[in-house]
Amino acid sequence: MEKIVLLLAIVSLVKSDQICIGYHANNSTEQVDTIMEKNVTVTHAQDILEKTHNGKLCDLDGVKPLILRDCSVAGWLLGNPMCDEFINVPEWSYIVEKANPANDLCYPGNFNDYEELKHLLSRINHFEKIQIIPKSSWSDHEASLGVSSACPYQGSSSFFRNVVWLIKKNNAYPTIKRSYNNTNQEDLLVLWGIHHPNDEAEQTRLYQNPTTYISIGTSTLNQRLVPKIATRSKVNGQSGRMDFFWTILKPNDAINFESNGNFIAPEYAYKIVKKGDSAIMKSEVEYGNCNTKCQTPMGAINSSMPFHNIHPLTIGECPKYVKSNKLVLATGLRNSPQRERRRKRGLFGAIAGFIEGGWQGMVDGWYGYHHSNEQGSGYAADKESTQKAIDGVTNKVNSIIDKMNTQFEAVGREFNNLERRIENLNKKMEDGFLDVWTYNAELLVLMENERTLDFHDSNVKNLYDKVRLQLRDNAKELGNGCFEFYHKCDNECMESVRNGTYDYPQYSEEARLKREEISGVKLESIGTYQILSIYSTVASSLVLAIMVAGLSLWMCSNGSLQCRI
């Protein structure tokens, strides 16, 4: 009898039509972090932090960089004889200088405001070298004897190519008065210098005059230099020193020189023919004959990601630099595939609903339905809610970029030895800015991930509520994301539930009768259980009374119990 009842129950269950609401799941192992959780496995995720580069120096948008090899910027601009390959250079996208280039100031000394000049070069893409005071024009001074073994060329003493070291001629050094008027339409970079002899003897041997000066004047510059004669240690075999200076001469402005000795005169100047975004990078990386839109000192970045952690100094169309090691954006749902548990599967397929886990069988949408009826079973994605969700997450990366559209740029400023405290302060400020920038990026990703996952959960709940409000009491909520119909629901009926056109009145009478039938079965079962309970109680009491009476008679017969009547 029990087997028959169980079989009838199974048949009844099989015949029950069901519809379940669930979400997509897959075999993804991608994980993201949120505000509340770490390492949440999701169906889809997008890494938004670029961590790789090609390890090469590349052309930037088709324009080659100026790679100075073993020359410094000072060696290039002054014309160190070992830097002759850079006498005339084409347009550059950025400048590359080694950390400690061998060919710097061959004659020992100092380049004043060198760091400021480098900063100026970060906004220039092309120089045109022009002659402003020909070497042959110094008829009253020796213009070819100013050479040094510290600046050798092909085994002989030489000097910087772009300036002239003027020496006395015929034991005389007449006072120099020279001017140059910038008739060009472009700004002009002009360089000059002063020589500081080792002693008085060298001073008179080279310049005849024991007391000398150099005066330089423009509309914005008023400078007077005097040599500093002192005994010094030898550098590159020289006890003397040279200081070099520069200025930007505006169009229609003139530069005036006056000197009676120790003058390093300009022969060539640099016309600034093209300004634009550039940079001076300290790098030991080799040129790779490649092209890129973003260059760092470590190598080129070719990426569409919004962030990178390669190097703070970049040039070009680059991702934003952060110190993070991981920035992964959730674009899909929590990934919790339904477990293969026999008791949870149901008889018509892998239906677990959104509480127990996602469906790997639903591949054409993020949210949807699984139905089962006499015509069969199957999955169907909810196109409308899926498309809205896709539209929402598609704009997520752009949203993050918009929220962080003001990037702090570490421009790689340089400081001289007298500015070390400023340099240290600048580094601390840059590090502080980058720390804040990184924190903001990480926090934004965590918040967006939390919002995305909550958004998906909300969409599933909304879909569930949409079905629940349609079916009302025509179906029973099973508590796992599924509804069991109280009426027959064929494929057309299932489709009406999915598209929101379910006709509740059409099925309400059939559902009411089914509910009453189920209630009657329950009441009948309760009545049967009550009869069986009463019968069991009476029978048990009767048996107990007979046993007590029998025991009493036995005890009376053997004298163990006195019986009085």
From Swiss-Prot:
Its main location: virion. GO terms for cellular component: host cell plasma membrane; membrane; viral envelope; virion membrane. InterPro entries: Capsid_hemagglutn, Hemagglutn_HA1_a/b_dom_sf, Hemagglutn_influenz_A, Hemagglutn_influenz_A/B. GO terms for molecular function: host cell surface receptor binding. Coiled coil: none annotated. Disulfide bonds join C20-C482, C58-C290, C71-C83, C106-C151, C294-C318, C489-C493. Keywords: Clathrin- and caveolin-independent endocytosis of virus by host, Clathrin-mediated endocytosis of virus by host, Disulfide bond, Fusion of virus membrane with host endosomal membrane, Fusion of virus membrane with host membrane, Glycoprotein, Hemagglutinin, Host cell membrane, Host membrane, Host-virus interaction, Lipoprotein, Membrane, Palmitate, Signal, Transmembrane, Transmembrane helix, Viral attachment to host cell, Viral envelope protein, Viral penetration into host cytoplasm, Virion, Virus endocytosis by host, Virus entry into host cell. The record marks R345, G346 as: Cleavage. Residues 1-16 form the signal peptide. One of its GO terms (biological process) is fusion of virus membrane with host endosome membrane. Glycans are attached at N26, N27, N39, N181, N302, N499. Palmitoylated. In natural infection, inactive HA is matured into HA1 and HA2 outside the cell by one or more trypsin-like, arginine-specific endoprotease secreted by the bronchial epithelial cells. One identified protease that may be involved in this process is secreted in lungs by club cells. The keyword Membrane applies. Residues 552-565 are cytoplasmic. The chain crosses the membrane at residues 531-551. A lipid is attached at C556, C563 (S-palmitoyl cysteine). Residues 17-530 are extracellular. Binds to sialic acid-containing receptors on the cell surface, bringing about the attachment of the virus particle to the cell. This attachment induces virion internalization either through clathrin-dependent endocytosis or through clathrin- and caveolin-independent pathway. Plays a major role in the determination of host range restriction and virulence. Class I viral fusion protein. Responsible for penetration of the virus into the cell cytoplasm by mediating the fusion of the membrane of the endocytosed virus particle with the endosomal membrane. This is Hemagglutinin. The lineage of its organism: Viruses, Riboviria, Orthornavirae, Negarnaviricota, Polyploviricotina. The gene is HA.
